[in-house]
């Protein structure tokens, strides 16, 4: 028989003819529902049913004060604060950092019946002592800090006065008023028998009310305690019950009811450590899968960490219905991601490109925005490399027919009007999203539920903003939204009388199950651990007997062990994973269970690692089909670049992805100059500077003419690449200066060459070339194409120069073993240089020796780094017909492999 069944049995035995006078008072609605069920099962004759209410409803009834919800309370408090504050009050955004904490403290002060005339001066005196030094005068900040503590009591009294006027209150306010109004309630309810069920930790107000009712008009309180904990003076699970049985006047003449001995009965306790939360979910799913259907009806799955609810539900495939009774954080829902993205977007005057793309990529908007609208905006931003974009430009990027929906996301408003519009538009978005929810979807009911919760939130926010107008910026709105969401949850309410019961720790109060599964039994979750979420110093709380972390730990201890009391089989899962900040420490409750050594308890502790199957990595190969060969023919006709050929040498599979499938990394907006753009700007600047002097012998005067043009030329090239970005700040400005240094150093290098007597004639700059590769055994014509950075004659010798903004070593442009030219990527730069040499000889139809070289801007002091090889063990820098004949022979072999249908593309390791 469960605890609640035993309560009903005992009450019916003691009050068989007074049933209609009974009022059952419980910790919440769920125990009340089970009490009703057991009452109906045990009463065998027709009778007027007793009343079942929660303790909060009883206090509301006694006090005559209606509860006020958190948001209106916060706004009322700020209103009282601004009218009471003697100095310049904090902005609403600043107030949010301490306002909710103060309200929580006010409620606790009232619940524990602490005299406000004493506690606030006490806190102020302590704070004053902290700042006292005896000599130094207080700073303005210290004075303001002390003024706050001196005024905290004024804020409390102002709020209390306002709430009294409204007839509404927070929890502690209602409890205090209930104590004040209790004598009248007792006078008018002498015929009522109150039955208090399932309580443990009680505030002073609750203790006073319950004791007074029991002693003055009669009734019972049924504890759910166990002698094992009560008789152990150091065990936290019995902390409150020991305290009440020893200190209540009621127990001077009465014995505590329902202190039983269930915990030491036979139990199986399985304590399982599992790495990562997701593996806990899978372990639970496996456990439930192997559980008979009938046993599931007597099983409770308790989710200690609410963030694990969805992973567990996704992993579980139950044989019976699943009924969830717990809260799920609204901030974990997909709809929250949409509104976070929505508000973040409007934090600055211009729209940041990442915020736009983040908003437009939200799954919920896919049903409201046409796919091409998202694509067009994304393409416009990336094509124009826009870091920030104005509303006007954004709307110009799409068709006018799509402006109406975009107006919801990007409203044309400013100041407080923008705040109102954003809230209104959020409500409109919810309406439109609700209309698009697919009723056939497995999740449509859940989606509707959290859409409604967001609607409630924004609707209430709209009313409060209209009434008070305290939110004066998008930043305040955004932070307020985040603050509210952090404390908001979606409350699931299932059918609690049948099926597998899934619940949180608090929802399990007063309920009993034969089999219990609890997840996340880790320190910081169960128990929660120390929390500094209070303005009241610990010493003050301790002296005035307010709740501290010690009492909170005792609450967690009771709740945990109460779940275990009547269970026959218990499965506790904890996370063993270590992250970068801290290890996931097993809960102290698990350590206690391991240390207890109770003979009737079978304790099995295990660490369960997920099965890992070693991956067998086989090199990926792609067979060539006729379609692939057709695509290669198109490529051959358009022209293959030297860099594409080196890509094949590096990894044929990458060549296939890029040149056949045309899979490249998606173009992104560059907020800071990337390597490709860096190179483009350097190349473009040198092209602009040298173009006026093509086919002329460079002189010192030419270089001197270029020098004052360096800065404006770089600026022009930057502006072409970054049309909307101010490159004169941050990293881009540093990179701008690096490019300027490179270009000026290059001109200085050229000037030194000229001064030393080198005759330089620039012939081509950034020259585009497309030529056929001539070889007798190719299956079809193949063209090479590319851009040669610079072609000079230096002292009459043709020089082909390939700029490199990275580092180039001499070994990179050297060939020792020609057999590795088309197989080893270390010859990649040398292969590219030879390809440029081959292309220029065909393009100019020449047959002369030449120098082909890299020029590394990071190693300008080394000058040109020319290709060289070895013939008859002699180093040779000249690229001649002999050199190019060797190159052609190996390159033909490479091309035959690329275009051979029988040679697959393969992945190089």
Residue ranges and their predicted role:
Residues 1-51, 55-57, 187-348, 511-512, ...:
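Conserved motor-region signature of P-loop NTPase helicases/translocases
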Residues 29-189, 204, 381:
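Basic/charged alpha-beta structural segments of nucleotide/phosphate-handling enzymes
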Residues 54, 193-202, 300, 305, ...:
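Conserved helicase core region in the C-terminal RecA-like lobe
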Residues 83-115, 191, 314-322, 354-453, ...:
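Accessory helical subdomains and C-terminal extensions of nucleic-acid helicases
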Residues 127-128, 132-239, 273, 514-515, ...:
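Conserved helicase NTPase motor core
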Residues 140-162, 190, 197, 217, ...:
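Accessory C-terminal helicase-associated subdomains
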Residues 337, 350, 354-358, 522-639, ...:
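Accessory/regulatory regions of helicases
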Residues 438, 517, 580, 619-909:
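RecB-family 4Fe-4S metal-dependent nuclease core
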